[in-house]
Amino acid sequence: MKVLESLSNQHKTGLIPDFAWVKDGTVTPAKKDQVAGANDGNYGANSCRLPWRLANSNDKAANQVLSKMMNFFLEESTITEGYTLAGKPLSSNKSENFSAPILYAAKKKEAYGNLVDSQSWVIQNGLSEDDYYGDTLTTLVTLQMNQK
């Protein structure tokens, strides 16, 4: 959790990169193409699951990391497919990969009701059938949201 806290504290957005390095107690985002591709050091296809994962934790530090990210997303008029850690959109496209985890986290806390409204399109539109990753995240999130 300390690594996530450190990464969250490095930017006012609280966004976490897809990959990071820990060396001698220092945490730094990976650079482009160091691990898997051009978005290694951005909030991308790997880190987009974090809101969903952190929302399932009762840990105080996890909730602080999540709150910082969610506050960033509250300010965005549209949640797009990836961001730099400073909050610059990497695309103008919406994506289930990014919206489904945010929807789940927003459902867990009343303060994020606007995100529930804006991200509900993920469920209302149904599965795309051509986006395995997005459809999988949407299905998992929907199942968990409906648990009693």
Where are these regions (language model features)?
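Terminal, non-catalytic domain-edge segments
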Residues: R53, A105-W121, N125-K148
